[in-house]
């Protein structure tokens, strides 16, 4: 176990430093502090036109690395242990697996024509990839990634595939349709279609799994689904071309990006009303929150940037330049 930085620096003999103790203590202090800094969450941003993933240190809000994936990276998910990224690559019809220790692609898994959204179950056991031109979802067991199950959905051009918090259900939105398909993960089959607004895109669950929120881009609405009944129970007017969804970890606020208005709106879960709207870059798309729920990172597809929002005060903090046409964000 590494002692805290202050203890090492002030009492080196306690830890057996007898040869040049001050210099040795300072060296260990620097290494310990560096290790602590590297442990801060990172935001990973796939850039469609650059063929890269930008790595943002959420402590400093600076890009600290760029991972070359090639092709057209879009959907992205991170393993719970922080060792791997899963990134869909549209031109090659594959899922790129990124080794985060080496920050390079370690393998590619064929999933189908034009993959987009990528989801991962909370326990990391399952990965899901929405495959647009196949009108299907590829379900992949993380322990045996070459064993893939393709599940057909009713919605045309599926975009996002998001697991419920308990991992039992997978909700799939479709760009060319007005439905969300529900897949039973254990059965590997679609069991229901829920009618929502036109061009449903982002999906987010409350932490307890009781509700799902779906942004419908062409309807400028967010649809609230009761997950036990698998039916819409409320519709919330959002901004123009609403598309991305992110849920604060405390379950009190749902964020929706408004692609046609360069803004992000905050929905109070208790009242079902928008309580704040924050300006961001052009064509805000998919988003992610830090684990503590304090900061929201928003990919701005036409500004080539990521906007950072104070997710408690609902105020803009800064914009971070990234690659061309950022698609979304995952924080791990």
Model-derived segments and spans:
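Bacterial N-terminal signal peptides that target proteins for export
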Residues: 4-25
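Predominantly soluble domains enriched in secretory-pathway, periplasmic, or organellar proteins
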Residues: 28-29, 33-332
């Amino acid at each position: 176990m590494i002692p805290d930085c202050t203890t090492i620096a002030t009492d080196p003999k306690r830890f057996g430093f007898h040869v040049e103790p001050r210099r040795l203590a300072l060296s260990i202090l620097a290494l310990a502090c560096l290790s602590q800094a590297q442990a801060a969450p990172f935001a990973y941003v796939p850039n469609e036109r650059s063929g890269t993933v930008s790595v943002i240190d959420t402590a400093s809000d600076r890009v600290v690395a760029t991972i070359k994936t090639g092709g057209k990276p879009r959907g992205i998910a991170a393993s719970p242990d922080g060792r791997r990224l899963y990134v869909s690559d549209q031109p090659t019809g594959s899922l790129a697996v990124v080794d985060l220790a080496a920050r390079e692609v370690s393998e590619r898994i064929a999933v189908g024509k034009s993959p987009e959204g990528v989801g991962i179950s909370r326990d990391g056991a399952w990965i899901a990839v929405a495959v647009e031109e196949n009108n299907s979802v590829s379900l992949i067991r993380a322990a045996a990634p070459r064993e893939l199950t393709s599940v057909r959905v009713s919605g045309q051009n599926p975009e996002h595939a998001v697991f419920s918090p308990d991992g039992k259900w997978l909700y799939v939105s479709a760009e060319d349709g007005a439905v969300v398909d529900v897949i039973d993960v254990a059965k590997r089959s679609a069991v229901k279609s829920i009618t929502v607004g036109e061009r449903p895109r982002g999906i987010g669950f409350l932490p307890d799994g009781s509700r799902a929120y779906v942004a419908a881009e062409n309807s400028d609405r967010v649809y609230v689904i009761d997950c036990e009944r698998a039916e819409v129970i409320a519709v919330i007017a959002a901004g123009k071309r609403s598309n991305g969804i992110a849920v604060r970890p405390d379950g009190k606020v749902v964020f929706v990006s408004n692609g046609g208005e360069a803004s992000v709106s905050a929905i109070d879960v208790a009242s079902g009303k928008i309580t704040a709207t924050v300006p961001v870059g052009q064509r805000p798309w998919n988003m992610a929150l830090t684990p503590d729920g304090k900061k929201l990172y928003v990919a701005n597809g036409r500004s080539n940037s990521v906007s950072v929002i104070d997710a408690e005060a609902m105020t803009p903090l800064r914009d971070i330049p990234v690659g061309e046409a950022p698609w979304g964000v995952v924080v791990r």
